């Protein structure tokens, strides 16, 4: 099944003529660390930005401590809560941020030492916090800073210090990180796995006990490195540097792009060499990917955009509400 192309001009590049009543205020400069904003990520109802000096601030709905303010208050909905009034995220002395990914009830950040730290709902954090069961990290006094444990299995202070994280993506309730040991890339995923979105051959929640492996078994592609990871609501996609991609997890609407609606990654014998690559249009490769709620899109090497999965509300941009 070849994936349907959606016009990038219609979806992304059309210049709309807004009236003054629609945009009656000039955008305000967001103050973060006396510098500009370099990275932003949006969760379900909270947002995080990293500035060019590699410091971070988060705001929005604060349940489960996901904004890292050591409380559950919302920030950004009242006066004197943004700019200089908004606290910086603290993950430990001397540590700065290189990437951030926000989910529904948690936030994860890639740290400058190659580790990942997460806060929010405990069972999603992939760290010792998960072993405490229900509850949250970041919603109470002295729960941030150096007290936040690292995600297990990679990073300089882990039991596998040779593996360092180089990118991260968070879905609704799971997270994945591309890791590297200076010779090859690997993938680690943790959180809820009810649809196989972790790619670990089960539907278990992973990372909430000390003995669970987060190592995702990907096909042996002859040393081709990993370029990008994108976690959707209940599926995950990975892009290799040669432009091939693969997806696993929930597939009720065909969002995995494999010509069927069979879920992948929730049972044995579905990952590794058995993992199917996405059926991109003939002769095309992908340069960037994005996984959403039951849908996936890829920018192709010819500049076109391919989207597939759930067509509800016209989200695929194919002038139809049909699944693709």
Give each language-model segment a name.
Residues 46-49, 58, 106-109, 118, ...:
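Conserved core positions of repeat-based scaffolds
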Residues 32, 89-92, 218-221, 279-281:
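Surface loop/turn motifs at the tips and blade-to-blade linkers of beta-strand repeat domains
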Residues 15-19, 59-82, 119-145, 188-211, ...:
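Short glycine/serine- and acidic-residue-enriched loop/turn motifs that recur at repeat junctions
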Residues 36, 43-44, 96, 103-104, ...:
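Beta-rich catalytic cores
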Residues 1-29:
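Sec-dependent, cleavable N-terminal signal peptides
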Residues 55, 115, 183-186, 242-244, ...:
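Structural motif
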